[in-house]
Amino acid sequence: VGARAVLGRTSVALAGVAVILTGIPASAKPAAGSFAEALAYSIAHPGVTPPGSNDYSCVPSAQHPEPVVLVHGFLENSYDNWASLSPNLADAGYCVFAIDYGNTGPVPALGALESIPESAAELSTFVDSVLAATGAEKVSIVGHSKGGTVPRYYARFLGGDRTVARIVALSPPNYPTAGPPVQDDVLQRLNEGSDTVTGIEYTTIVTRYDQIVVPYTASLLTGAGNTNVVLQDVCPANVVEHTGISYDPLAKRLVQNALDPENSQPISC
């Protein structure tokens, strides 16, 4: 109870700071340029979803047969995490679906508050609904922060090995970190034996300037089928941090290349 009270006060403070810093009124058009702008908009418009997402009439194309499921991180929501990447993916021809989960705190816009196993159960239900609506056999999942770890739990323990083609994760806390605690006991169980599941393609995209997952190497997987990408190894001048990575042009291009490696596009720094 005490921890939740502290989290509640933190959530309210964070919400107020976001609105004060961005100054976006409730009547503004949806922001897609930065996390801070999108957070403020999502607080003023509870339940808003990112552009290009959650069209349950979408029919997957032959080029992109797997719908893309976007999974936000801790104290985030589908809009503030994916207001830039979601329309990019939709414009590229993907059926895009963005989950909001774990919205149990005093500010609905700040989600992913439940445990990794509970969050993975919500993701499982959401994926089932996407598969039922689209007729697809599998999905690809893109997650940020905790939203990159939750799909791994789903894949290993809740049947996701049968429904997930690939997992692309941005700055996920895959191993214990000096930053905010992420259920180290769950991570130990999740990583035991192998930190990947056979048959799933993994791409883990990280930044050396991550101030939440510390050290940033706690994101990196070692199992078969995974590709680790450090942004600064690709573009040394890139300085994006943890929260901004889902808005970073380089990271977004790497996500799209990971989703469709046969048609990957050149990288521009």
Give the ranges of each region predicted by the language model.
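Conserved alpha/beta-hydrolase
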Residues: 90-106
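C-terminal catalytic-base region of ester-bond hydrolases, centering on the histidine
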Residues: 198-269
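Alpha/beta-hydrolase active-site loop signature
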Residues: 75, 103-105, 174
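Second-shell loop/turn segments in exported
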Residues: 73-77, 108-115, 178, 239-245
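Serine-dependent carboxylesterase/thioesterase catalytic core
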Residues: 71-72, 96, 117-196, 205, ...
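Conserved beta-strand scaffold positions in the cores of enzyme catalytic domains, especially
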Residues: 68, 96-98, 167, 202-204, ...
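Flexible, membrane-associating and regulatory peripheral segments of lipid-active enzymes
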Residues: 2-92, 268
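Short, well-ordered alpha-helices that flank and scaffold nucleotide-derived cofactor binding pockets
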Residues: 87, 91, 156-157, 257
